[in-house]
Amino acid sequence: MFNELVKKIKSGLEITFEEALALGGLDEDRLNELFLAALQVNRHFHGNRVDLCSIVNARSGRCSEDCAFCAQSGHYRTEAPVYPLLSKEEILERAREMELRGARRFALVTSGRGISESDFEKVLDIYQMLKEKTGLGLCASLGIIGYDKAVRLKEAGVGMYHHNLETCRSYFPHICTTHSFDERVETVKAAKEAGLEVCSGGIIGLGESWRHRVEMAFHLKELGVASVPINILTPVKGTPLWGRPLLEPVEVLRTAAMFRLVLPGALIRLCGGREAALRDLQPLALLAGVNALMVGNYLTTSGRRVEDDLQMVADLKLSVM
């Protein structure tokens, strides 16, 4: 089964929805075959390189949206920090720190449905500074934006825009009611139209089914995104998803491998929640189709030491892009 599937994908043909759906029912004693297939596809399209990105929570809390997983939503009582846009100096310090520690990309992430014009002007100024004073690839995650803002970001030096779908269209209403799935899709399309690469993925462990994950993967394939962040839910006290169990490590790996087979040319990026969900199996993700990591801290939770991730990459005889 997997030999033929790998040959098909390497030749430029695509895995079908039904084939991807069937991976959810694969017996656990055959998961190593799935992981090997994902590794072979990954090596064919990307070699042995791993992309490392980092973020700064540039404006935190008081978001108007009701995303059920989010610590920064103003609809829920959580312990997430609340502060306005960080200063240029604070952001430059964090960017330089992450560059010195091995990150290749750096993103400003701001809470909220979108970004105000006044904050947007400040963000453009910050990106121009980062372009001049660092060698980092610059990414932005500023919520829902249109074509005009995307163009201005590109002109300021941003190369990639991040905006998650979060889940598939059919499950999205269970997760958010204050904006639509289509608004997220339109943001992705606007960024692409402006000439930006797009980083878009979602969160697994929200209560969605395997079919929902496959649907999300095919949505992303249709949109032609360059990078697919996979986050694993870490339930936050005070949110509607508090108390949900963590996904089993093998379920995370199964999902990552499926995304690799559906999106062979994209970066499959393991992000928030990987430490808690995968525990000691994090290296196995890089042998099961994953070829990118978010390093350092996340928005409201701590990551592990960047040095530990770099050692993991080196121990697997992989190289940083």
Swiss-Prot record:
SUPFAM superfamilies: Radical SAM enzymes. Residues 45-274 form the Radical SAM core domain. The keyword Ribosomal protein does not apply. Pathway: Cofactor biosynthesis; biotin biosynthesis; biotin from 7,8-diaminononanoate: step 2/2. SMART domains: BATS (SM00876), Elp3 (SM00729). NCBIfam families: bioB. Its EC number is 2.8.1.6. One of its GO terms (biological process) is biotin biosynthetic process. Homodimer. Pfam families: BATS (PF06968), Radical_SAM (PF04055). [2Fe-2S] cluster binds at residues 139, 199, 269. The gene is bioB. Binds 1 [4Fe-4S] cluster. The cluster is coordinated with 3 cysteines and an exchangeable S-adenosyl-L-methionine. Binds 1 [2Fe-2S] cluster. The cluster is coordinated with 3 cysteines and 1 arginine. Keywords: 2Fe-2S, 4Fe-4S, Biotin biosynthesis, Iron, Iron-sulfur, Metal-binding, S-adenosyl-L-methionine, Transferase. [4Fe-4S] cluster binds at residues 63, 67, 70. HAMAP family: BioB. It comes from Pelotomaculum thermopropionicum (strain DSM 13744 / JCM 10971 / SI). PROSITE patterns: RADICAL_SAM. Belongs to the radical SAM superfamily. Biotin synthase family. One of its GO terms (molecular function) is 4 iron, 4 sulfur cluster binding. The keyword Transferase applies. Catalyzes the conversion of dethiobiotin (DTB) to biotin by the insertion of a sulfur atom into dethiobiotin via a radical-based mechanism. This is Biotin synthase. It is an enzyme of class 2 (transferase). It catalyses: (4R,5S)-dethiobiotin + (sulfur carrier)-SH + 2 reduced [2Fe-2S]-[ferredoxin] + 2 S-adenosyl-L-methionine = (sulfur carrier)-H + biotin + 2 5'-deoxyadenosine + 2 L-methionine + 2 oxidized [2Fe-2S]-[ferredoxin]. Its cofactor is [4Fe-4S] cluster; [2Fe-2S] cluster.
